[in-house]
Amino acid sequence: MIKAKKTYVLKLYVAGNTPNSVRALKTLKNILEQEFEGVYALKVIDVLKSPQLAEEDKILATPTLSKILPPPVRKIIGDLSDRERVLIGLDLLYEELSEGDFEE
């Protein structure tokens, strides 16, 4: 039986085209392409251009990465350069490990 893959919906909040924002986006895209190729949707929101979206989602700092789906919603604020921290913080590493086959 083939298991249906989950789709991950993520939002990345950045403040303009700063080096920190560019680095966060580049790192995140790298992680997503390696770990979740074809099963994710990423929306990048510039809080300087769309402050109302940041306010609605209660974003207080950038960069902030928010996992919307699958539930529960999870957020990581700040540095996204540590792959494992990002995956654990968004509850993605646990899901990845729990779905694997563990044989002794």
Swiss-Prot record:
The keyword NAD does not apply. Pfam families: KaiB (PF07689). CDD domains: KaiB_like. SMART domains: KaiB. It comes from the Bacteria. GO terms for biological process: circadian rhythm. InterPro entries: Circ_KaiB, KaiB-like, KaiB_domain, Thioredoxin-like_sf. Keywords: Biological rhythms. The keyword Metal-binding does not apply. Key component of the KaiABC oscillator complex, which constitutes the main circadian regulator in cyanobacteria. Complex composition changes during the circadian cycle to control KaiC phosphorylation. KaiA stimulates KaiC autophosphorylation, while KaiB sequesters KaiA, leading to KaiC autodephosphorylation. Phospho-Ser-431 KaiC accumulation triggers binding of KaiB to form the KaiB(6):KaiC(6) complex, leading to changes in output regulators CikA and SasA. KaiB switches to a thioredoxin-like fold (KaiB(fs)) when bound to KaiC. The KaiABC complex composition changes during the circadian cycle to control KaiC phosphorylation. Complexes KaiC(6), KaiA(2-4):KaiC(6), KaiB(6):KaiC(6) and KaiC(6):KaiB(6):KaiA(12) are among the most important forms, many form cooperatively. Undergoes a major conformational rearrangment; in the free state forms homotetramers as a dimer of dimers. When bound to the CI domain of KaiC switches to a monomeric thioredoxin-fold (KaiB(fs)). KaiB(fs) binds CikA, leading it to dephosphorylate phospho-RpaA. Has 2 forms, fold switches to a thioredoxin-like fold (KaiB(fs)) when bound to KaiC. Belongs to the KaiB family. NCBIfam families: circ_KaiB, PRK09301.1. This is Circadian clock oscillator protein KaiB. It comes from Nostoc punctiforme (strain ATCC 29133 / PCC 73102). The lineage of its organism: Bacteria, Bacillati, Cyanobacteriota, Cyanophyceae, Nostocales. The gene is kaiB.
